Amino acid sequence: TFNAQYAWDKIDRINKKRYNKRKRLVNIGYIISGVAATLLLVLGFSKMGVFDKQPEMLVRMTADYGSRSEVVLPDGSVVKLNSGSDITYSYNAKEKIREVNFQGEGFFDVSKNKIPFVIKMNNGLRLKVHGTSFNLQAYTDEKTVEASLVEGCIELDHGNEKLLMNAGDMAVFDKQTNRMRPVSGVLSHSYSWLEDKLYMDHMPLASVCKYLERRYDVTIHLQKDLG
């Protein structure tokens, strides 16, 4: 005998199987299209240089009170930091950034390069070099900034005022007047701290005590009539 219900159920199962197969094919098509679109986006961004841009990393190196340190910058320049100093720079794996923020005292041995090496200080003073060695004293709590050039040529820059220095020159920038001027003195005395020596050429007693506080991480109290 012919079973009509059984026949309809069989036809229904066949139709469902065909529909599901077609649906899977459509879904696979969507997935392939999505992958292709993603690849196109990646290629597009790559051509635009989006993935070529490396994130910059801010690096800060310090020499605490009672210590000293040596820093080798990404461009090969070497900075010896005196006690109570710090230097901050941006690091990028693909770009040689020759710009630093500095406070304290340091002896810079800057590698030669067409790109200028720029030192920024918090009072707006800038020092620009291409390849040279010099001592820079720029403590935040001091009234002056002192630069002593051993080799090469450097330029001090503050607003519209500039001072070009040659080997053997020494200069002072007054933070209160925002003026800079050449000074005379014994050049080697400015970086004698590298050998743990201190020359107190006309140095006030308060400045001597401040130097000793940084160097040995101690606190010195002066009587008012001695300061």
Language-model-detected regions and their locations in the chain:
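A residue-level detector for the "anchor" residue at the start of short, highly conserved motifs
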Residues: 7, 11, 15-227
